[in-house]
Amino acid sequence: MSTFSKIDILWNTVKYLKPIQWRYRAKLWWQRVFPQNLQSLDTTPDRQILNFVPSIPNEITYLGDNTFQFLNLQKSFGEQVDWEFVEFGRLWGYNLNYFEFLNQKGMDVREGKKLIQDFIQHFPKARMGMEPYPLSLRSINWIRFLSCNGINDVDIDAVLYAQLNLLIHKLEYHL
C-alpha cells in the first residue's frame, strides 16, 4: 500500500471526528507517553459488603497453578503471572487483566486472593489493562469476588480504590 493511500485512509477516518474526540485523543496520547503514578492511595475507603444475586458462573479460564486459557490459547506462567503478557495478542492480555476467572465455578478463594495480591505487586508499574474498560471490568470482578467470599483486606481495598479513582479521570470521549 502506498504512502498516499495510507494518508487518504487516515484522512477519511479522522475527518469525521468531533473536536471533543480530537481533544481526548490528544489527552490519551499524552497519558500513554507520560503515564500517571499508579501507586495506591494512602486513604482507606469506607467499605460495605454487597449481596450479589447468584448468576451464571463465568467460563472456566483459570486452570490452576497460574495457567490460563483465553481464546483457545493456553499459557502457564510458573511462579508469577506476567500481567503485561502480549505474546498471544493484546486481546488475550486484556482477558487476563479482566479477572473474570475470579467468578468461575469452583474457583478456590485462597487462589483467587493470591492472584489479586500478585496483581497488586505488579500494579505500580502496570501499563496493560489501564484503559477504562479493563479497569472497570476488573474492578467489578474484584468487588463481586470479595463480597461473595466475605474478604475484607485493607491492601486489596486500597488498590481497588486507586483503580476506581484512576477510572474517574479516564473518560472515553476519544471513541
Give the residues covered by each predicted segment.
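Acidic-enriched, low-complexity/disordered segments with a strong bias for Aspartate over Glutamate
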Residues: 8, 42, 46, 65, ...
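Extreme N-terminal leader/anchor segments
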Residues: 1-78
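Aromatic-lined, polymer-binding surfaces characteristic
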Residues: 89-175
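A generic structural signal for ordered alpha-helices
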Residues: 4, 8, 79-80, 116, ...
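Repeat-mediated protein-protein interaction surfaces in helical alpha-solenoids
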Residues: 77-86
